[in-house]
Each structure stands twice: as C-alpha cells, then as structure tokens.
C-alpha cells in the first residue's frame, strides 16, 4: 500500500527562475513500449518516462513475452511480433493507468489467449465499457464487475474481425484501443472521431512501418483506417518532454510574480497544445523557441514569464487537445481578471477522479468562485485572497500538482492531503519545482 505524502504549500518567496526539462511524454512512453513489443526486432527508447504508470506497462509487456531491459539511459525492447504475444502467467496489474489498461485491452482482444487485468482502487472505479463494447465486435469477450469496472477477464480471439466504429465522444484512448485491435485482424479497421484527438498512436504506428490512412470528415472530425494483419518493424524512439507535465511549471511561472523560466525539449504535437493556445489568449508571456522534429514529433523550448492574465472562453472542440490540463488551467483562471468559461468537459468525469467535481472543490475550498452549468465550468476570476483550504486529491496526480501550483501563488497556505500519486506521471516533480525556486518542503 502506498504511503500518503501530505504537503503544505506556501507562496513562493521569490519568482521562479532557471532552465529545466520535464519527464518524457506519458502517452508516447506507453505506446513506445507496447508497439516495440509488437514489432519484430530490437527497439531502443530514449527519454522514457520512468513514472509508475509507464513502469506498469513495461511489466505487462514483459508478462506477455517481450524482453525489456534498461541499458544506461535507454530502454531496450526485444519485440515478439504482431499476434505473437504469449498468455500471461499472472494477473496484469495496471496500477493507476487508465491509458495502459484501455490500450492493452485492444491488443489483448486480438490474441488467442485469456488474461485478467486489474488496477489500484482508483482505476478499479473507472468504467471500461466505452472500450470493451466496441472491442467485443471483433469476436473477443470481456467479463467485468458491475458497471464495466476492473478486475476484468479478457478472452481474446485469434480470428479477430475488423471493427468499424464511430466514437460518440472524442477519446484518443478508445480510438487507440480499436486501432491496436485491428493490427491482428483480417480486414480494414475504421474509427471515426467527431473531433481530432491526440494522434500519437497514428504517428507511432507509421514510425513502426504500419500504413495508417487519415482523412477529414464532417466539421473537424477524422476517419482513421488500417488494414491488418500487419507486420511492425523495430525502430528506435526518442520521447519528447510531456506537454501535460510542462503545464504545471508553466502555470506556476505565469502566476508567481517575478518568474522567468525555460522548459527545454517539450513535445509540441498540435493535438496536445490547446493549453498553450489558451494561456496565450489569456495574455500569457509564453513563447516557443528552437522548434525541431525528434522521433517523428515536433519539439521546442518554452520561455515563460510572469503575466497578468485575463479571463477566457474555451470552446468545447479544444478539449481533446488539453483534456489533462483543465485542472491547472482552472487554477490560472482563478487568478485572472474577469470570468472564464471552460466548455465541454464531460470527459473529465471519467478520469482518475471525477476531475470536474474535484477541480471545483479544489478551487472553492481555497476561496475561488465557480459554477458548473451542464459540462461547462465557469471560474469567476480573482475576487480576493486565495488559499487556506485543504485539497482532497482522490489519488489523482494532476489534481495534486494543480493544488501545489495554486499554493505557490496564493495569499494563504494550501494543504494537499496526498502528493504520493504524483509519481505516476511526474517523478521528481517537487525536486524540479524546488530547483526553480518553489521552496516546497515535503
């Protein structure tokens, strides 16, 4: 059982300053391990996020027959080939990682063996039906707890049928699970999404030699298709810095007077940079320098300086490009001049916690004024001193880091009930923030 780590956060005594790098992108790290295990040959991965979530994925792929070792700063994966994974001898424990659980469900559905998947208390409370229902169309079977929750037994099929599915709600995880099931299916798998979601799966499949066809449909939607079964060839991967992790020092620097920081090597996939666009609309001094391409993904260095922010109206179609950043964006909105409206946040209700409700609670207990109308969050802007509350994080790493950011800029200390789960996505978060001058004392 993980030991809790409460933390009291007081305003930073001076502006944040310096240059830093955030850990590797979590989405790309998960996929690099999974795809390398499905490829034929040896893959070297540089910059892998070594957080608990990603290490669970490494353990799962080892249990399925891949050889995964660490050599210096690199991770080395000896792949099995598509369709050649082997039945695990034990339960696959995905810890806190919904991404790993959902993507791996797609892979397991088209392998002819049985497996059982579980997770921690938080993951076991999250619904899986929006993945298992479309996946079952390929001939696989899923047995879950009531409400479609883990633990889950999966009876994969060696004669997987191709799936054609239109997502009712945009979700990169559901899209990816279906595409991964299609790698070992006979025929063309098609996923249609109402708005474009992060496309790391499509990019990395191409990197490993898979032909993926992407076309535009409707108003901003996309059709993604691939024809299986495929062969994947081992290719080395360089993982860029995670823009979702960069969000926390970015917002902290914008809110703490006198701050001036650089964050190097951050991934700039256009389907992941909605937060940067939004902050600039709010008046943030945030610039991108030294843009380049590494491992098939755009990368750049971010320069961030303290800024007086103004309220913003965020359209719902931007949600997929910043779905993990809404809690820390809401913190920024609480310090802004004027009200902000963050629209179309239904996806937040099925994250590690009900992130919409948890974000509202985080703000309200620290003196901010909020209102929820349907799936929209309204933050009424700065109306007086903030802080002084205790934040219940519900084992949600992003909520915990958002609370820390609020505390660094608030007039009164903020108590965070548990920061232990930050390690799932951002190992070394406190040390990184302290190196910039945050003055956090665990």
UniProtKB/Swiss-Prot annotation:
Keywords: Amino-acid biosynthesis, Aromatic amino acid biosynthesis, Cytoplasm, Transferase
Catalytic activity: 3-phosphoshikimate + phosphoenolpyruvate = 5-O-(1-carboxyvinyl)-3-phosphoshikimate + phosphate
Positions with biased composition (Polar residues): 1-11
Entry-linked Gene3D superfamilies: Enolpyruvate transferase domain
Binding positions for 3-phosphoshikimate per the UniProt entry: 26-27, 31, 171, 173, 324, 351
Active site: 324
Cell compartment(s), UniProt: Cytoplasm
Source organism superkingdom: Bacteria
Gene Ontology CC terms, in alphabetical order: cytoplasm
SUPFAM superfamilies for the chain: EPT/RTPC-like (SSF55205)
Keyword Lipid biosynthesis found: no
GO molecular function terms noted in the UniProt entry: 3-phosphoshikimate 1-carboxyvinyltransferase activity
Amino-acid positions noted as binding phosphoenolpyruvate in the UniProt annotation, renumbered to this chain: 26, 98, 126, 173, 355, 398
Pathway(s) this gene product operates in, as recorded in its UniProt entry: Metabolic intermediate biosynthesis; chorismate biosynthesis; chorismate from D-erythrose 4-phosphate and phosphoenolpyruvate: step 6/7
Family, as annotated: Belongs to the EPSP synthase family.
Role according to the record: Catalyzes the transfer of the enolpyruvyl moiety of phosphoenolpyruvate (PEP) to the 5-hydroxyl of shikimate-3-phosphate (S3P) to produce enolpyruvyl shikimate-3-phosphate and inorganic phosphate.
Protein name: 3-phosphoshikimate 1-carboxyvinyltransferase
């Amino acid at each position: 059982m993980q030991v809790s780590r409460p933390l009291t956060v007081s305003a930073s005594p001076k502006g944040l300053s310096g240059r830093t790098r955030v850990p590797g992108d979590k989405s790309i790290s998960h996929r690099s391990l999974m795809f390398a295990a499905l490829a034929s040959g040896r893959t070297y991965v540089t910059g892998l996020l070594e957080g608990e979530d990603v290490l669970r994925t490494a353990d799962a792929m080892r249990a399925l027959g891949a050889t995964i070792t660490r050599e210096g700063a690199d991770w080395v994966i000896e792949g099995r080939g598509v369709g050649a994974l082997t039945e695990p001898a034990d339960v696959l424990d995905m810890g806190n990682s919904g991404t790993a659980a959902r993507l791996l469900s797609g892979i397991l559905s088209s392998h002819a063996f049985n497996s059982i998947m579980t997770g921690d208390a938080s993951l076991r409370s999250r619904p899986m039906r929006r993945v298992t229902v479309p996946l079952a169309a390929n001939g696989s079977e899923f047995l879950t707890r009531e409400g479609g929750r883990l633990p889950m037994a999966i009876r994969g099929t060696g004669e997987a049928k191709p799936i054609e599915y239109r997502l009712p709600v945009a979700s990169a995880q559901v899209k990816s699970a279906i595409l991964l099931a299609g790698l070992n299916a006979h025929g063309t798998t098609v996923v249609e999404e109402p708005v474009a979601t992060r496309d790391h799966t499509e990019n990395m499949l191409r990197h490993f030699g898979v032909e993926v066809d992407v076309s535009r449909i409707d108003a901003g939607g996309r059709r993604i298709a691939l024809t299986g079964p495929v062969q994947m060839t081992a290719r080395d991967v360089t993982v860029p810095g995670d823009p979702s992790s960069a969000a926390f020092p970015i917002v902290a620097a914008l809110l703490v007077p006198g701050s001036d920081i650089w964050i190097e090597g951050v991934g700039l996939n256009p389907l992941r940079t909605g937060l940067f666009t939004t902050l600039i609309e709010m008046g943030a001094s945030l610039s991108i320098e030294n843009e380049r391409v590494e491992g098939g993904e755009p990368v750049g260095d971010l320069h961030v300086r303290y800024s007086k922010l103004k309220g913003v109206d965020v359209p719902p179609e931007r949600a997929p490009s910043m779905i993990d950043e809404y809690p820390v964006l809401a913190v920024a909105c609480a310090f802004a001049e004027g009200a902000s409206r963050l629209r179309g946040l239904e996806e937040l209700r099925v994250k590690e916690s009900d992130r919409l409700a948890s974000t509202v609670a985080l703000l309200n207990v620290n003196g901010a004024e909020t209102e929820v109308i349907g799936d929209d969050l309204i933050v009424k802007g700065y109306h007086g001193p903030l802080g002084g509350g205790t934040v219940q994080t519900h084992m949600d790493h992003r909520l915990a880091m958002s609370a820390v950011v609020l505390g660094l800029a608030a007039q009164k200390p903020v108590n965070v009930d548990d920061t232990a789960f930050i390690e799932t996505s951002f190992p070394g978060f406190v040390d990184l923030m302290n190196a910039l001058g945050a003055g956090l004392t665990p």
